[in-house]
């Protein structure tokens, strides 16, 4: 009986963790979009706030023994910290200049780009069926972008740069974790302050600092509270991702990501009244089919690899 109670509690904890991640992941997209649309807060400055709050949050976490920091040489993290800046800044610029549907769908292109990088730069091979799933993903993104009545060329440039830098960042994070033998929180603990320092230097060259529209400009209390809330939620997203992967698996997190993908798209059309044509809807379904097929084939191949290892004498 006690064992059954423990199992039920465990399932409830995981369900609560997944629900929390769902809420904060969707909330951060809509909140950032709201800040851009209704307050006009500068992009790089918002990213800087996110990085600083994330580092402060991680500092509190390590003081509470949630994780143990590991000493890392800063010189080996410079490129990673720079790509971290790039991926968050360009992703936020994509959100600022595109509809939520186009922003969310463009992010799906990260999978094909990661596969291309690993194939050409790291000589990693992928099965034919995995490669074929890239066709519906890419076709769906093209369909949605082509028929988007709010199509924005600058927004698509930012989306493309965001996908490229995000893909590089994700590949490098995996490589650095393996190379330095650290987990994601230990890596982020060093990365966040380095990225904050880089943005602190860059912000004055691209955005006003003290004048109208600057980070220290005459903002309303509501705008400042929303920016601070955005930073706290961004940290919660990172923390909940780490908790979910640690208590379930990366596969569970990715499968749950498909549900968040659909909810975020739907919320964008409801909250911000983004128009949706039939062809765009077909593009979304096409991309979603490709993502689900990719996940299914990837799972099958991982299970096959485990079975072969288990059968070895």
Curated annotation (Swiss-Prot):
Bilayer-crossing regions: 17-37, 40-60, 77-97, 126-143, 153-173, 187-206, 225-245, 252-272, 275-295
Protein name: Solute carrier family 35 member E3
Record GO cellular component, one term: membrane
Record lineage: Eukaryota, Metazoa, Chordata, Craniata, Vertebrata
Main location: membrane
Subcellular location(s) of the protein: Membrane
UniProt keywords, alphabetically: Membrane, Transmembrane, Transmembrane helix
Source organism of this protein record: Homo sapiens
UniProt similarity note: Belongs to the TPT transporter family. SLC35E subfamily.
Gene Ontology molecular functions: antiporter activity; nucleotide-sugar transmembrane transporter activity
Membrane topology: Multi-pass membrane protein
Domain of life assignment: Eukaryota
UniProt KW Glycoprotein keyword: no
Function: Putative transporter.
A GO biological process held by the record: transmembrane transport
